[in-house]
């Protein structure tokens, strides 16, 4: 048996090129008997940190690959910073405008309009074309109550900051000069000391994060960097690998004998999002995550209709169509892996952030 390693460089979302192998070689395996453990070794190549993914492949005595594993070389923030460095610069400046009911951030032909009464995104346009991301961010698995909001310019970037009471402290929206819209959400910040009457979280916590509305009728597929190509559950993540994946839209319901079954299933939770492009001839959209370990929920799969009545096999999905989640539920099973999470805020906690960027440009 033998193993080999590869350092892979992945293309950015706007390029459909295949991944590039920057370096590869053999892994030095220890001489061990079945059931024993040992340490494998290989030397890092000079170009190691120029890559995005480390891939390990195992081969049997016949030379057939029997298993492979992938590991990210860069965390989400470093990957996104490098992506931004590759983008063309602009001398333009973002701006904002307001009326009695709304706030609008504007840059490079992209406009994002928010409701003054609750801080929610209500409409996005690229030129005259409406991108149907709206009605969010709605809280998932937690409570948050709109408190206040303010607008400002920071250099060439327009910033809309929304303050909340409850489990969420604030969401900062940034319109960059090139038209990218950033969302920086701070949650579980005990230091904020916002007074909120009631329970901060759902009990139990099955999903935890934020949701938006986005109709699926015009979506033709999805291309993404993260774990794939399959959807996941909290206790069904093993077996997925880091990489750039592509799948066409389908409504496969496993167990429905009268449907054409197309795999991988399109709808569901996707692990460790770096970026994802929802493909559409009319309203494409790409989202990037600067935060490690975010689950991307894409629409809501149907339950089997003709199964025996033995209870629902999966937990209820969040409201909305697209969700960005710190936590997802497990598929029903025995053992601790199927248990819901428990969240506790301790005195002095600074909270943690979810940082996303939305690209509505063609």
Give the location of each predicted region.
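Carbohydrate-binding surfaces of carbohydrate-active enzymes
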Residues: 1-105, 111, 360-361
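Beta-strand/loop-rich accessory regions of lumenal/periplasmic or secreted enzymes
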Residues: 47-49, 78-362
